[in-house]
């Protein structure tokens, strides 16, 4: 290694040269020596500069390496986060699309049910209107019957008043009849008394007549005795006078007796006639009263029968009206209950639709937020790529439907110096589904989120699944669902067994809820098997997740690091080789 020459000999040489003359050869050598010293000084300075530059270069290389590692980690983290969020966004969009399709189907079903309910409701309304019309007709008829009943009751009251009047009149006539009977009895007693008096008078008259005859006989006997004494001349005159006087007395007595008898007979006949007339009048009044009473009784009986018939008819109409009112109340209650139930169902459906709309809005908000974040990440990456002068290529997402797998690939541009080149096919995650069935029932679908498993009857006949067991295995963990003994899967129909936390209502026989299990479980390798009641496996379905990293990624990574190493290390090695050559 060249070193600097001390200044002492150089000054002494100069002094000696000044003191003694130098030859041209000496001057040339001295000049060459001075040039060599200057070259050595410049070389030493260059070596020091190269060493300092190498140390700075090594420090810069370390810093660049650290920054590149940090950058690569940040880019890989951002890329993974972006890819995971993008995959989650796509998954959520797929779930949203499936949920939207399912909700559209449910909405169509609900709309059909709503139309059916509206038709049944309109039918019930028409029936209710017809029932109300019949009720109004019945009510009008009942009102007419009530009016007729009121008129009949008023007539009955008037007839009862007449009956009371007739009863009062009958009482008066009865009292008059009793009075007439009493008078008749008194007249009869008076007649008997008068007859007795007449008989006693006749007997008294006969007795007096006998007494008179006896007196006459006694007088005649006396006169005879006197006549014996009287002369025969005056006897004839005396007898004539006596006979005349006797005849006069007899006529007077007979006339008096006749008058008295006639007077008695007239009095008796008049009283008897009066009594007979009074009796006839009383009997005619009683007969007329009896006839009127009979007519009144007949009329009362007819009115009573009519009243009873009207009351029976009124009770029948009242019962019918009560029955119709009960039927109408029941129909109203049923209609009200049906309307309340339908309104509650519509409210539930509206709540579900509102909840689904809210979920849609939340999903749309999440989607918009993800889109905004993705656009922000894209702008950030584009800004970094523009700042680092990269040539970016658009990302690409491929979905393989034929093999039932999904692959997410992103392409990245090639960077200079500290930028990292990423391959076009960086990574892929595939989901492979395989299914097999030995019978008519197959496992149609297994949800990757563990919400449901769907079975399908591929035959044209109903298939009983009583005692069948559905098992889902993830690694070493497994869950079992057993069908009830009476369950039958209809021909060409599907049945979906939902987990308890799937948020779906039970709708047998197409949708069943496993209340004891919140989720079917999620994982990378999923296997679902269906066994019959004898324990034989009749169907299975397997879902396998596969992550592939292509060889081009490693090769391109090696090329990236080789180019980076060339860019950073080769200039240093070249400078070192130059230094060594110079040395």
UniProtKB/Swiss-Prot annotation:
Comp. bias intervals (Low complexity): 1-23, 390-408, 425-436
SMART domains noted in UniProt: Filament
Domain IF rod: 32-388
Localization, UniProt: Nucleus lamina; Nucleus envelope; Nucleus, Nucleoplasm; Nucleus matrix
Region span, Head: 2-34
Positions where lipid (S-farnesyl cysteine) attaches: 580
Stretches the record annotates as Linker 2: 216-243
Annotated segments matching region Disordered: 1-25, 387-436
Pfam families, per the entry: Filament, LTD
GO terms of molecular function: structural constituent of cytoskeleton
Propeptide residues, chain positions: 581-583
Region (Tail), start-end ranges: 387-580
PROSITE patterns for the chain: IF_ROD_1, IF_ROD_2, LTD
Site (Heptad change of phase) residue list: 268, 332
Residues carrying Cysteine methyl ester: 580
Domain of life: Eukaryota
Keywords: Coiled coil, Intermediate filament, Lipoprotein, Methylation, Nucleus, Phosphoprotein, Prenylation
Stretches for region Linker 1: 70-81
One cellular component term from this protein's GO annotations in UniProt: nuclear lamina
Region (Coil 1B) location: 82-215
Functional summary from the UniProt entry: Lamins are intermediate filament proteins that assemble into a filamentous meshwork, and which constitute the major components of the nuclear lamina, a fibrous layer on the nucleoplasmic side of the inner nuclear membrane. Lamins provide a framework for the nuclear envelope, bridging the nuclear envelope and chromatin, thereby playing an important role in nuclear assembly, chromatin organization, nuclear membrane and telomere dynamics.
Misc. remarks from the entry: There are at least five different lamins in Xenopus: the somatic lamins L(I)/lmnb1.S, L(II)/lmnb2.L, and A/lmna.L; the oocyte germinal vesicle lamin L(III)/lmnb3.L; and the male germ cells lamin l(IV).
Record protein name field: Lamin-B1.S
Species of provenance: Xenopus laevis
Gene assigned in the entry: lmnb1.S
């Amino acid at each position: 290694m060249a070193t600097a020459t001390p200044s002492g000999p150089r000054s002494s040489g100069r002094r000696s040269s000044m003191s003694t003359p130098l030859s041209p050869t000496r001057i040339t050598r001295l000049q060459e020596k001075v040039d060599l010293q200057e070259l050595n000084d410049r070389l030493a300075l260059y070596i020091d500069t190269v060493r300092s530059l190498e140390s700075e270069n090594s420090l810069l290389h370390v810093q660049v390496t650290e920054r590149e590692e940090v950058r690569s980690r940040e880019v890989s983290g951002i890329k993974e986060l972006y890819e995971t969020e993008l995959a989650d966004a796509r998954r959520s969009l797929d779930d949203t699309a499936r949920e939207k399709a399912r909700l559209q189907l449910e909405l169509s079903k609900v709309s059909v049910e709503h139309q059916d309910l509206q038709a049944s409701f309109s039918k019930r309304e028409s029936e209710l209107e017809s029932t109300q019309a019949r009720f109004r007709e019945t009510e009008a008829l009942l009102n007419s019957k009530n009016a007729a009943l009121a008129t009949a009751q008023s007539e009955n009251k008037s007839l009862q008043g007449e009956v009371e009047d007739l009863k009062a009149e009958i009482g008066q006539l009865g009292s008059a009849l009793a009075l007439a009977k009493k008078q008749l009895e008194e007249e009869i007693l008076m007649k008997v008394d008068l007859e007795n008096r007449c008989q006693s008078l006749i007997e008294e008259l006969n007795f007096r007549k006998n007494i008179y005859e006896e007196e006459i006989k006694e007088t005649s006997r006396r006169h005879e005795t006197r006549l014996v004494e009287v002369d025969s001349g005056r006897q004839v005159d005396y007898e004539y006078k006596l006979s005349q006087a006797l005849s006069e007395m007899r006529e007077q007595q007979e006339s008096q007796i006749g008058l008295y008898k006639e007077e008695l007979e007239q009095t008796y006949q008049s009283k008897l006639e009066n009594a007979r007339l009074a009796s006839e009048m009383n009997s005619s009044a009683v007969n007329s009263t009896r006839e009127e009473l009979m007519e009144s009784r007949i009329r009362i009986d007819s009115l009573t029968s009519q009243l009873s018939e009207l009351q029976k008819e009124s009770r029948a109409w009242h019962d019918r009206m009560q029955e119709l009112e009960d039927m109408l109340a029941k129909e109203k209650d049923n209609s009200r209950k049906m309307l309340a139930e339908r309104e509650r169902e519509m409210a539930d459906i509206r709540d579900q639709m509102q909840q689904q709309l809210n979920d849609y809005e939340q999903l749309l908000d999440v989607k918009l937020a993800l889109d905004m974040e993705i656009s922000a990440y894209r702008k950030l990456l584009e800004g970094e790529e523009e700042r680092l002068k990269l040539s970016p290529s658009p990302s690409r997402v491929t979905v393989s439907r034929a093999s039932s797998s999904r692959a997410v690939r992103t392409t990245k541009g090639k960077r200079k110096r500290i930028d990292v080149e990423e391959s076009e096919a960086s990574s892929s995650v595939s989901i492979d589904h395989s299914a097999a069935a030995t019978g008519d029932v197959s496992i149609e679908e297994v949800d990757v989120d563990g919400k449901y498993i769907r079975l399908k009857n591929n035959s044209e006949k109903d298939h009983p699944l009583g005692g069948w067991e559905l098992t889902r295995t993830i690694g070493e963990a497994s869950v079992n669902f057993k069908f009830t003994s009476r369950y039958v899967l209809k021909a060409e129909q599907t049945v979906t067994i939902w987990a308890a936390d799937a948020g779906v209502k039970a709708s047998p026989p197409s949708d069943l809820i496993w209340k004891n299990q919140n989720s079917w479980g999620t994982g990378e390798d999923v296997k679902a098997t269906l066994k019959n009641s004898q324990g034989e496996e009749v169907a299975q379905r397997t879902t396998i997740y596969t992550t592939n990293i292509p060889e081009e990624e490693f090769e391109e990574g090696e090329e990236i690091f080789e180019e980076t190493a060339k860019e950073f290390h080769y200039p240093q090695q070249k400078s070192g080789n130059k230094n060594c050559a110079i040395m």
